[in-house]
UniProtKB/Swiss-Prot annotation:
Residues 893-903 have a biased composition (Basic and acidic residues). Residues 1253-1255 are annotated as: Important for rapid channel inactivation. Belongs to the sodium channel (TC 1.A.1.10) family. Nav1.4/SCN4A subfamily. This is Sodium channel protein type 4 subunit alpha B. The sequence contains 4 internal repeats, each with 5 hydrophobic segments (S1, S2, S3, S5, S6) and one positively charged segment (S4). Segments S4 are probably the voltage-sensors and are characterized by a series of positively charged amino acids at every third position. It comes from Danio rerio (Zebrafish). Expressed in skeletal muscle, heart, brain, spinal cord, and eye. It is found in: Cell membrane.
Length: 1784
């Protein structure tokens, strides 16, 4: 805290002097000495304790206000450091006029310019001047404009030199002021300056050195656009976030590339060469022999059998004239030779010839092209084309391949990228918010500190000051008084979250005032300034001219106007006018009669008048001053002004754009429509946050557009004939900047492959792939996902609360008034009618019921409930808890719910929430043990005969009958039977295709089956009626569904019996049988969970967003109608299939003249057009899903005037309309669906207490098992064989190295497979065969070795069985390759399967943790994804059946052909699967939109009684739009929600210090120490075990003390249990915490459940206790020994004196009896001294020799002498095992 307090006094800012430099040197020397001292003393400082720079004093930040203003003479000159961190570093700062801090190095710049050098000072002044950066910015922008010119003027070369000169000058200034690269804060130490350096170097390099390809090098100039990032401050941070997210994407990228490689290999093996199969015209007669045997050398054979080589077979089949082309297609028709592949027309044969489709770039012929195809499939770009080509060439069964890749690659991996980007963004947001909060607290503390200082300084005078400032604070709660009484706005919530920290930006002039009075004045001034941001003159002007309070009559008039114009009814009227105006605008269409046009024009005038009047009245009522303070009023005034301007300029040509401003009126609805308001807010918030991101995106788009133009522009113009038949530039090219920009924008929309093919064809493959991939990855995957992440974050929390004003809006008040009025009239009429009819008896009842009801209704209907009801705990008025934060209340609410269970809810409460559907279902399932009442109480009251006595007679019989029915219905067999019947009846629908008429037998069977199913379902329904009663049956949503479907079947069955089956109405009713599979929903728990919990819950919010999207799109649709209605028509020649040139036919009149003489000429309209708002919506849906949007855009861009022939790119800038719509209509609104679903998903989760809502109980168990595998128990390791050779093999194969070696071999095997190509030579094929053979031998060897070593245990491991099967299949594959390939799939596929083994090796690589997390997230998502997949299949099934019954006979053109159609169930499913990702639906819809003369309603369909090949346009549009909304927007987005959720969970899991792999590793190590799997190891092996573990659980040696302190429980026999040890080690890693205790408990429980044996081994001690016992014992021992020793010495001394007689001992001997006395006696005995020199240890003491006693016996010596002295402390070298137990 103290570090932020500036030094008090006036000397905060000190100029830099020579003394300052000396001081810095002194401090540096001190610091170096201190570090040296710490190094010597081995003192380590934790990283977080190291000093850090103060964030507020970083270079580029504004000086904190706390420092006050620097004196003017110290601005723009070097001054001493303010940041304590840099005090001991060679730096100084410079502060400019705006108080921005710049930091420089004190070392001489370029070795010669010291900080005092005038040149350097001048450079510094220039560098920090605001004009300098402005000039540079303008230079960059001007340079960008010139770079974007495709054909710059001649003098631009001179400008180029000027730009280079300015950049050089900038760099020179930076180098002179900062120094070049040595030391901190020099020029090259800032990575952004590297960019400048490169740009300038390249400019000089290309100028003076001839480097060949100049255009490629000139593209480096584009990097100058990046310099904008260095100049605009906010951009650096967003680029930082982008770089962060790219770093985080590394793992996803690796996983994606790996998966794509695997899929590409599979594609390579399955489809290599297939796409070259084409329909070739049968060769001329006579090229083959009579018996049709083709000779191998393909020579022509004449009639008599002699070979004739004039016919060149290769040339014939490679000639493009001999191929079959579908009209309008560039490539020949692809075909296949399998039974379910595409067939050729009559007279053609399917052969492999020529090149691949799309210039030869779409193929699986080698790994590179296969990888590109799979990447395209994963990004879903034009994948329907690849899908159709592959199915046509290989067969429909291969749809499975695409299903797997779309679900795994496209839905999973691409969304993982979104998840990672969203997480990176969220993390950054949190960090910013946390930093802001921290600063806020810090500054609050500083304020306190300064306040205290000020108080101490000012003494008693302070009293008056504080009272004044506190009074001020009382007046305005928004203010905080600081230390000088200066009012400061606290950080608002929004500011905090966005990181705009404004609390530093208080006018600095008011800081550190000398006197108290002036301090108070300054506080008041500051307050005024904050409230009134404009100069004072403005306020005087406003008071005079903008506040109209001139005289009393006027004021009274104003008040009347105010009462009128602010009345809720007027608001209601205006809202209705807005709606009506919108309807009027939406009524415009083409062709429109003059009368309608007049009505609409008058309507527009009326509405404009109404809105203008409203504005004028509000201006009068509120005064302009207050009127323009409200955002909505400003919005209104702009629109009204624009409308009036438009009316004035109505006749001016080209200003029709002003008409579109009227459309903005629709947004006024947001005032009273919370969801629309919320959406606009979210877009507003996002646009705020997206400001910088949009700039970055714009820079990226600009750079790539210029790069494309510079690199490929010339190639497009030179090689245009390769991609265009008429050698004219196509629509998508890079020859000029605008078209290059459009191509880059198209790539950002996800459509890159088609433009890339063109680029590769004209400019070569390498460069195009690099540029397009960079745009795709950087632009589309990263930046656009960041957009989405921002949108999702806008959804969170605050923004979702309803409108700002918590009160209700005027509209609700008006409506509640109306409803109350109606209720009052009803009651009044009712009362008078009863009086007239003299209904006396019911009068009181009428009073009670009539008025009571009316009142009650009024209460119920008025949105603000008048009645205040005490609500029981656990209830709430609305879902979001009245705007109170849910987080706080959730827990309490849960507890209350559990306690009360709803018992205390107030009976009369009008706000009780009705139980939700799911609750009802649950209750019925659980509570019904016997039948309930058949009828409701009201029914029984009305018809008393229904109330039977069930205790006797008929009533009892009826009750028993009901109970029997109930038992039947509730029986599990009954349910299973019904499910079986539902599946059968649904399956039967799939057979009713176009061939049913030809299969009479199947048709008859189906008719009878249909009757049977109907009877079964009717019986089921009747049984349920009897069993459950009507009340229960008809209050259950699922039963209603059953009821309606059974009704449909009954009606169609009855019609068949009566012979009305061909009636149109009955036919359309029969199509509703397609809904039958829906009944399966209620029966399959998995799907019901998804549908009820997730979908039904989301429907209101999805519907809301859908409505808002429709309103949003309505604006664009009406605008489209204004711009393009009637302009999409063209004159067309049906014979040549060409559009006439505008020089031949200019307009409709010319075309009709031609038509008189040429019947093949037609004046046609585009099928998708903007002739009315409805068609406009359809067109916009195609644009938003990027399907069919090209044709719409081409028509728009070519359009001229109504009924005029289109001209190529006549209206080029209409592209901008579509660009704007794509940004707002597609990026924003479609992504809102994801936002809403995720948000709803989280709300549902919160309701259910955080459990996963997409899973059943069973699946949750699986999920939890996946989440924590901590309950593993030790396994018995495979015993090592006793045989010596086997033992060696065993040691070899169980090495980790062996595993990794095999993995490397698998990868090498894959690499050799990648080398395969379709057109490889025979030698390469042979080499590859032998390499593969070698690998098979190697893997077989591995298999044999493992079986030898592991014996029968080999087959107890799943992976080994997998390896074994692959090896067997590989061996078989070599021998029976041809046979397997003929009947099954290519045997090489088995090799690809081996790649699955790489999953095993991930565990061994610590670096692969991120990838393991991603795979873990996938595993966790599987159960929920399976349920959603089921639901998706159900929707696909229903729509397929529906499509078959409606569109089976549609004319085959555009997207419908012999493979893609609705003729059979299989084909329908393929089509529906394709549309799931919204791919190709425009092509399928186009033929359905046909009407005569484009189709023939009377044409015969062979083999069927149905006539005609026209579709029903209305049904088609509803069919496709509803399917796209359901599957593409809802179900697929649920996938995204789940993946985001599980990715977050998995990331949390993996960020835990311990993961599953660590537990696995623990148990693997345990197996080696506990071969019998007894779950125990000896205490003496504990140290070695802990050392053997891997991090983070490892405790390296020496670890004895550490293990002792860990207090690990021990059982009898000095053994330690694995769980106890694991818990102790886990505690060591996680640190002691509550979390740890919880974990211990759960692990104990899990382990107990798995291993009941542990209970019998109760711990009796622990490592710590054992040590404490040992220490205690040795301490007692030592004390006792010391005591004994003392007594021994005493006794010895006594006896010595006694024996030697040196001095007669006085008194008795200390020890007469006992051990010491006996031992002493045996030591000395009773004899006299035998000689003068007794044996013993003699030693010199004070120069005299002391004589020892006679040598004692050995036993006594050891017992007394050795045991009675404390041992010396052993040396550290002593081995632990040799230590005596008495050593401590």
């Amino acid at each position: 805290m103290a570090r932020l307090l500036p030094p008090t006094g006036t000397d905060v800012f000190r100029p830099l002097t020579l003394e300052s430099l000396a001081e810095i040197d002194r401090r540096m020397a001190e610091e170096a000495a201190e570090q040296e001292r710490m190094k010597e003393q081995n003192v380590k400082v934790a990283e977080e304790d190291l000093p850090k720079p103060t964030s507020d004093l970083e270079a580029g930040k504004v000086l904190p206000f706390i420092y006050g203003d620097p004196p003017p003479n110290l601005l723009n000159v070097p001054i001493e450091e303010l940041d304590p961190y840099y005090k001991a570093q060679k730096t100084f700062i410079v502060i400019d006029k705006k108080n921005t801090i710049y930091r420089f190095n004190t070392e001489p710049a370029c070795y010669c310019l010291s900080p005092f050098n005038p040149v350097r000072r001048a450079a510094i002044r220039i560098l920090i001047h605001s004009l300098f950066s402005l000039v540079i910015m303008l230079t960059i922008l001007t340079n960008c404009v010139f770079m974007a010119m495709s054909d710059p003027p001649g003098w631009s070369k001179i400008l180029e030199y000027v730009f280079t000169g300015i950049y050089t000058f900038e760099a020179m200034v930076k180098v002179l002021s900062r120094g070049f690269c040595i030391g901190d804060f020099t020029f090259l130490r800032d990575p952004w300056n590297w960019l400048d350096f490169m740009v300038i170097s390249m400019a000089y390099l290309t100028e003076f050195v001839d480097l060949g390809n100049i255009s490629a090098l000139r593209t480096f100039r584009v990097l100058r656009a990046l310099k904008t990032i260095t100049v605009i401050p906010g951009l650096k941070t967003i680029v930082g976030a982008l770089i962060q997210s790219v770093k985080k994407l590394a793992d996803v990228m690796i996983l994606t590339v790996f998966c794509l490689s695997v899929f590409a290999l599979i594609g390579l093996q399955l489809f290599m060469g297939n796409l070259r199969q084409k329909c070739v015209l049968w060769p001329p007669v006579g090229w083959y022999s009579d018996n049709l045997t083709v000779l191998s050398n393909y020579t022509d054979i004449n009639g008599n059998g002699t070979a004739n080589s004039t016919f060149d077979y290769q040339k014939y089949i490679n000639s493009e004239e001999n191929y079959y082309y579908v009209p309008g297609q560039m490539d020949p028709l692809v075909c296949g030779n399998s039974s379910d592949a595409g067939l050729c027309p009559e007279g053609y044969i399917c052969l492999k010839a020529g090149r691949n489709p799309n210039y030869g770039y779409t193929s699986y012929d080698n790994f590179g092209w296969a990888f590109l195809a799979l990447f395209r499939l994963m990004t879903q770009d034009f994948w329907e084309n690849l899908f159709q080509l592959t199915l046509r060439a290989a067969g429909k069964t291969y749809m499975i391949f695409f299903v797997v890749i779309i679900f795994l690659g496209s839905f999973y991996l691409i969304n993982l990228i979104l998840a990672v980007v969203a997480m990176a963004y969220a993390e950054q947001n949190e960090a910013t918010a946390a930093e802001a909060k921290e600063k806020e607290e810090e500054y609050a503390k500083i304020m306190e500190q300064l306040k205290k200082q000020a108080e101490q300084k000012n003494g008693m005078v302070n009293g008056s000051k504080t009272s004044l400032s506190s009074k001020k604070k009382g007046d305005n709660d928004q203010m905080q008084s600081d230390y000088d009484g200066i009012a400061l706005k606290p950080l608002s919530k929004s500011n905090g979250s966005k990181g705009n920290i404004n609390y530093l930006e208080v006018p600095d002039s008011q800081i550190r005032k000398p006197s108290v009075v002036s301090a108070v004045e300054s506080a008041l001034d500051a307050q005024e300034d904050i409230e009134r941001p404009c100069p004072p003159g403005w306020y005087k002007f406003a008071d005079i001219f903008l506040k109209w309070d001139c005289c009393i009559p006027w004021v009274k008039f104003k008040r009347i106007v105010y009462l009128f114009v602010m009345d809720p009814f007027v608001d209601l009227g205006i809202t209705l006018c807005i709606v009506l105006n919108t309807v009027f605008m939406a009524m415009e269409h083409y062709p429109m009669s003059v009368h309608v046009e007049e009505v609409l024009a008058i309507g527009n005038l009326v509405f404009t008048g109404i809105f203008a009047a409203e504005m004028v009245l509000k201006l009068i009522a509120l005064d302009p001053y207050y009127y323009f303070q409200v955002g909505w009023n400003i919005f209104d005034s702009i629109i009204v002004t624009m409308s009036l301007v438009e009316l004035m300029l109505a006749d001016v040509e080209g200003l029709s754009v002003l008409r579109s401003f009227r459309l903005m009126r629709v947004f006024k609805l947001a005032k009273s429509w919370p969801t629309l308001n919320m959406l606009i807010k979210i877009i507003g918030n996002s646009v705020g946050a997206l400001g910088n991101l949009t700039l970055v995106l714009a820079i990226i788009v600009f750079i790539f557009a210029v790069v494309g133009m510079q690199l490929f522009g010339k190639s497009y113009t030179d090689s245009v004939c390769k991609i265009s038949s008429d050698c004219e530039l196509p629509r998508w090219h890079m020859a000029d900047f605008f078209h290059a920009f459009l191509i880059i924008f198209r790539v950002l929309c996800g459509e890159w492959i088609e433009t890339m093919w063109d680029c590769m064809e004209v400019a070569g493959q390498g460069m195009c792939i690099i540029v397009f991939m960079m745009v795709m990855v950087i632009g589309n995957l990263v930046v656009l996902n960041l957009f989405l992440a921002l949108l999702l974050s806008s959804f969170s929390g605050d923004n979702l609360s309803a409108s700002d004003d918590d009160g209700e809006n005027n509209l609700q008040i008006a409506i509640s008034r109306i409803t109350r009025g109606i209720d009052w009239i009803k009651a009044f009429v009712n009362k008078h009618v009863r009086q007239c009819l003299n209904l006396k008896p019911k009068e009181e009842g009428a009073k009670v019921n009539g008025e009571g009801d009316a009142k009650m209704n009024a209460i119920m209907n008025s949105s603000s409930s008048m009645v205040k009801v005490p609500i029981a705990n656990g209830e709430s008025d609305d879902d979001d808890g009245n705007g109170s934060s849910e987080d706080e209340d959730d827990e309490g609410r849960d507890i209350n719910m559990k306690k009360k269970n709803g018992d205390e809810s107030s009976t009369c409460s009008t706000v009780d929430k009705p139980p939700e559907v799911e609750d009802l279902v649950e209750e019925e399932e659980e509570d019904l043990t016997s039948p309930e009442d058949c009828y409701t109480e009201n029914c029984i009251r009305r018809c008393p005969c229904l109330d039977l006595d069930v205790s006797q007679g008929k009533g009892k019989a009826w009750w028993n009958f009901r109970k029997t029915c109930f038992a039947i219905v509730e029986h599990s067999y009954f349910e299973t039977f019904i499910i079986f019947m539902i599946l059968l009846s649904s399956g039967a629908l799939a057979f009713e295709d176009i061939y049913i008429e030809q299969r009479r037998m199947i048709k008859i069977i189906l008719e009878y089956a249909d009757q049977v199913f109907t009877y079964v379902f009717v019986v089921e329904m009747l049984l349920k009626w009897v069993a459950y009663g009507f009340k229960v049956y008809f209050t259950n949503a699922w039963c209603w569904l059953d009821f309606l479907i059974v009704d449909v079947s009954l009606i169609s069955l009855t019609a068949n019996i009566l012979g009305y089956s061909e009636l149109g109405a009955i036919k359309s009713l029969r199509t509703l049988r397609a809904l039958r599979p829906l009944r399966a929903l209620s029966r399959f728990e998995g799907m019901r969970v998804v549908v009820v919990n997730a979908l039904v819950g989301a429907i209101p919010s999805i519907f809301n967003v859908l409505l808002v999207c429709l309103i949003f799109w309505l604006i664009f649709s009406i605008m489209g109608v204004n711009l393009f209605a009637g302009k999409f028509y063209y004159c067309f020649n049906e014979t040549s299939e060409e559009v006439f040139d505008h020089n031949v036919v200019n307009n409709k009149t010319d075309c009709y003249e031609l038509m008189e003489f040429h019947p093949e000429v037609r004046w046609m309209n585009g099928k998708i057009n903007f002739d009315n708002v409805g068609m406009g919506y359809l067109a916009l849906l195609q644009v938003a899903t990027f399907k069919g949007w090209m044709d719409i855009m081409y028509s728009a861009v070519d359009s001229r005037a109504i009924e005029s022939q289109p001209v190529y790119e006549a209206n080029l800038y209409m592209y901008i309309y579509f660009v704007i719509f794509i940004i707002f209509g597609s990026f924003f609104t479609l992504n809102l669906f994801i936002g809403v679903i995720i948000d709803n998903f989280n709300q549902q989760k919160a309701k259910l207490g955080g459990t996963d809502i997409f899973m059943t109980e069973e699946q949750k168990k699986y999920y939890n098992a996946m989440k924590k595998l901590g309950s593993k128990k030790p396994q018995k390791p495979i015993p090592r064989p006793t045989n010596c050779c086997q033992g060696l093999v065993f040691d070899f194969v169980t090495q980790q190295f062996f595993d990794i070696f095999i993995m490397v071999m698998i990868c090498l095997n894959m690499v050799t497979m990648m080398v395969e190509t379709d057109d490889q030579s025979a030698e390469i094929e042979e080499i590859l065969f032998y390499i593969n053979f070698a690998f098979i031998i190697l893997f077989t060897g591995e298999c044999v070795l493992k079986i030898t070593a592991l014996r029968y245990h080999y087959f107890s491991i799943g992976w080994n069985i997998f390896d074994f099967v692959v090896v067997i299949l590989s061996i078989l594959g070599i021998g029976l390759a041809d046979l397997i390939e003929k009947y099954f799939v290519s045997p090489t596929l088995f090799r690809v399967i081996r790649l699955a083994r790489i999953g095993r090796v991930l565990r061994l690589i610590r670096g692969a943790k991120g990838i393991r997390t991603l795979l873990f997230a996938l595993m966790m998502s599987l159960p929920a994804l399976f349920n959603i997949g089921l639901l998706l299949f159900l929707i696909m099934f229903i729509f397929s059946i529906f499509g078959m019954s409606n569109f089976a006979y549609v004319k085959k053109e555009v997207g419908i052909d012999d493979m893609m159609n609705f003729e059979t169930f299989g084909n329908s499913i393929i089509c529906m699967f394709m549309i799931t990702t919204s791919a190709g639906w425009d092509g399928l819809l186009a033929p359905i939109l046909n009407s005569p003369p484009d189709c023939d309603p009377d044409v015969d369909n062979p083999g069927s009684t149905t006539r005609g090949n026209c579709g029903n346009a209305a049904v088609g549009i509803v069919f496709f739009c509803s399917y796209i909304v359901m599957s593409f927007l809802v179900v697929v987005n649920m996938y995204i929600a789940i993946i985001l959720e599980n990715f977050n969970v998995a990331t949390e899991e993996s960020s835990d210090p311990l993961c599953e792999d660590d537990f696995e590793m623990f148990y693997e190590t345990w197996e080696k120490f506990d071969p019998t799997a007894s779950q125990f190891i000896d205490y003496n092996r504990l140290s070695e075990f802990c050392d053997t573990l891997k991090d983070p659980l490892r405790i390296p040696k020496p670890n004895t003390l550490k293990l002792i302190t860990m207090d690990i429980p021990m059982v009898t026999g000095d053994k330690i249990h694995c769980l106890d040890l694991l818990l102790a080690l886990t505690g060591e890693v996680l640190g002691g915490s509550d979390q740890m205790d919880g974990m211990k408990a759960t692990m104990e429980e899990k382990f107990m459940a798995n291993n009941p044996s542990k209970a019998s081994y109760e711990p009796i001690t622990s490592t710590l206790k054992r040590k404490q016992e040992e220490v205690a014992a040795s301490t007692i021992q030592r004390a006792y020994r010391s005591h004994i020793l003392k007594r021994c010495v005493k006794q010895a001394s006594y006896m010595y004196r006694d024996k030697t007689g040196s001095k007669k001992p006085t008194g008795e001997a200390p020890e007469k009896v006992g051990m010491i006395a006996e031992n002493m006696r045996s030591l000395y005995g009773d004899q006299a001294v035998e000689d003068d020199h007794p044996v013993g240890c003699s030693f010199s003491q004070h120069g005299k020799t002391q004589f020892g006693a006679k040598r004692p016996p050995v036993k006594v010596q050891s017992d007394v002498v050795l045991h009675s002295a404390p041992f010396p402390v052993p040396e550290s070298s002593t081995a632990a095992d040799n230590l005596r137990e008495s050593i401590v």
